[in-house]
């Protein structure tokens, strides 16, 4: 994966340029995948592993849920079958939103509470990486629409949940790599976007809806901004 990741960057930067937003989304989503595979949720490991009992079951559940999310996103991209999107799009989108949230919650809880043996890759961390890929693919396949609706009230509920999950995954990997300090700083600014109406003086503002705020974060004024473009 790492070799392919580096090869993609060399190809895009030296041979064939890739559309900027698409390049940055691939950079972020595959980077998250590699990060979750490399960095464990903590520095402690189980002497007996998490391969027995409930630990193994929860790990498997997280992997299955994340795989379902990825398959559904790929189905949207390939429009297979088209009848799902033409006649039952609302049901499909609601199901995708629900299973995506369930996948990230189960995977995070599993990675926190069930420790793996040293040297063994956790299915829960793999599941988090798969979800990161799904988020990237979802935004890429809807990029033309995303450029128009991100940060506006027109953003759909699925757009909200996918961008929210993307932010959660970025914060979690930041915690694993850099510690809680960076996460706390980021959370303060996220809370500021919603608490503005109740703040005093010059800090007061009208506030933002979740749809507007989290989808706006996945634009070139947020996650896909100058830091990633360098």
Which residues fall in each region the model found?
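Conserved, well-structured core domains of diverse proteins
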Residues: 1-154, 160-164
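Hydrophobic transmembrane alpha-helices of multi-pass solute/ion transporters
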Residues: 16-23, 87-88, 147-230
